[in-house]
């Protein structure tokens, strides 16, 4: 006879192994925070490239929160709340390496977090 506790333990193990998924609008703040996290990490990894882009496009500005997050190596996600979805999209898609570097990294990060997006 199987004990009820061993069945419960088995169900808990299966549930822990299955990743939960969530479908969110592309403008949802949780999606924006994942996108901004990837963006900040990319800026840190390719800072010279972003400086050159900024020099060539001085009208392309960044919110002060993004600049602070780039140079604050602690938990920066709380700094990035409140940036509008339109501004997030403009910043991320406005660089020439969006399609080749940022978009795949964002897709991977969203998938890792079990987040799938739908168009607004």
Swiss-Prot record:
Record keywords: Transmembrane included? yes
Q: Write down the membrane topology.
A: Single-pass membrane protein
| Origin superkingdom | Eukaryota
State a GO cellular component annotated for this protein.
fungal-type cell wall
Has UniProt tagged this entry with the keyword Cell cycle?
no
UniProt KW keywords: Membrane, Transmembrane, Transmembrane helix
Principal localisation = membrane
Among the GO biological process terms of this entry, one is:
fungal-type cell wall organization
Under the GO molecular function aspect, what terms does this record hold?
Answer: structural constituent of cell wall
Query: Localized where?
Result: Membrane
Q: Which InterPro entries match?
A: SRP1_TIP1, Yeast_SRP1/TIP1_CWP
Q: Where are the transmembrane segments?
A: 7-25
**What does the similarity note say?**
Belongs to the SRP1/TIP1 family. Seripauperin subfamily.
| Protein name listed in UniProt | Seripauperin-20
Q: Which organism is it from?
A: Saccharomyces cerevisiae (strain ATCC 204508 / S288c)
Q: What is the lineage of its organism?
A: Eukaryota, Fungi, Dikarya, Ascomycota, Saccharomycotina
Encoding gene per record: PAU20
